[in-house]
């Protein structure tokens, strides 16, 4: 038994080291790749000063943090709701952030600064989160809380559809691009959003013990002494914050929160002590590679990153499911 535990521990360490190395390589690729390839040796030149330090570095950092946040949100929600299909959009938090952002675009007539749009997106996500907490205070079961989140998401989606229908052509283009996701407008002015993500990401990665208990089910978690109501509220708030900030920076991006935790579980990483940091690293890698593809796929334009993640990720996910079923 001790030998098996040591082997498992070594395997987990190898996984985390491998993912960390891949994050470094993907970051290097993201900083070098673009309309002009800039090798690391040229980063201190005048051209590197503009393209790498002023344009690509803030974008790369934003992609890293958003990828980690979305993957961690998916892992937390799948443990919290005991549902492998749970992901950040399922509770309606992503759509709530979308409603806040769309309301700011329409009411501000495109004149609001980027920081104001970001605050509105975060406010929308937190409003949906507070509504969910109101349901949670009634001691609803996890399944009913999940259904409440789905219903809120449908309502927010309907509001966004109405807003797009009544918007002007300029607003419509801006809203449609946001709904497909993208990092094209990220620069150092959004650094406050990046900083807002970091403490919550670190805190979530340290919560392996309660999440391991929650993954066993509500009854088992109570028997083990976990204050279920408290932890459910804390995790829902943390998830709402991460999703709201991510939507404010990059718009709606699917696939990452659903598939990354699932893929790691299929690879044998079931303990949240390893799964949480693994999700943060793997989510960052996946979104970095998708962002590079979005930038380089077309010579004259940039693809929406949400389209890239769905197109590349869905076949890989199906293949892994079929492989695990054999």
Swiss-Prot record:
Matches recorded under Gene3D superfamilies: ABC transporter involved in vitamin B12 uptake, BtuC
Main location: membrane
Coiled-coil features, chain-numbered ranges: none
CDD domains: TM_ABC_iron-siderophores_like (cd06550)
A GO CC term attached to the entry: plasma membrane
A GO molecular function held by the record: vitamin transmembrane transporter activity
Gene, per the UniProt record: btuC
Pfam family, one: FecCD
Keywords: Cell inner membrane, Cell membrane, Membrane, Transmembrane, Transmembrane helix, Transport
Domain of life: Bacteria
NCBIfam families for the chain: PRK03784.1
Quaternary structure, from the entry: The complex is composed of two ATP-binding proteins (BtuD), two transmembrane proteins (BtuC) and a solute-binding protein (BtuF).
Cellular compartments annotated: Cell inner membrane
UniProt-recorded name of the protein: Vitamin B12 import system permease protein BtuC
């Amino acid at each position: 038994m001790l030998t098996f535990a040591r082997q498992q521990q070594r395997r987990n360490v190898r996984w985390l080291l491998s993912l960390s190395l891949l994050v470094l390589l993907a970051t290097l690729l993201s900083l070098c790749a673009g309309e002009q390839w800039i090798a690391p040796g040229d980063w201190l030149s005048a051209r590197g000063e503009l393209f790498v330090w002023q344009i690509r570095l803030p974008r790369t950092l934003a992609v890293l943090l958003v990828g980690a946040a979305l993957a961690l949100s998916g892992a937390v929600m799948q443990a919290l709701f005991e549902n492998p299909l749970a992901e950040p959009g399922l509770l309606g938090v992503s759509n709530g952030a979308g409603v806040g952002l769309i309301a700011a675009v329409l009411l501000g007539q495109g004149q609001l600064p980027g920081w104001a749009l970001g605050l509105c997106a975060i406010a929308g996500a937190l409003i949906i989160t507070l509504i969910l907490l109101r349901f949670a205070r009634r001691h609803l079961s996890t399944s009913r809380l999940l259904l409440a989140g789905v219903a809120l998401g449908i309502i927010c989606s309907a509001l966004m559809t109405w807003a797009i229908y009544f918007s002007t052509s300029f607003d419509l283009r801006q809203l449609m691009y946001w709904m497909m996701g993208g990092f094209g407008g990220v620069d150092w002015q959004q650094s406050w959003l990046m900083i807002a993500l970091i403490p919550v990401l670190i805190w979530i990665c340290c919560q392996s013990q309660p999440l391991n208990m929650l993954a066993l089910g509500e009854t088992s978690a109570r028997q083990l002494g976990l204050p279920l109501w408290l932890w459910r509220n804390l995790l829902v708030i943390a998830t709402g914050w991460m999703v709201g900030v991510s939507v404010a920076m990059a718009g709606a991006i699917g696939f990452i929160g659903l598939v990354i935790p699932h893929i790691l579980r299929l690879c044998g990483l079931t303990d949240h002590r390893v799964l949480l940091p693994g999700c943060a690293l793997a989510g960052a890698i996946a979104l970095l590679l998708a962002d590079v593809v979005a930038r380089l796929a077309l010579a004259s334009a940039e693809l929406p990153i949400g389209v890239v993640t769905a197109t590349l990720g869905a076949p890989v996910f199906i293949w892994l499911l079929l492989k695990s079923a054999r």
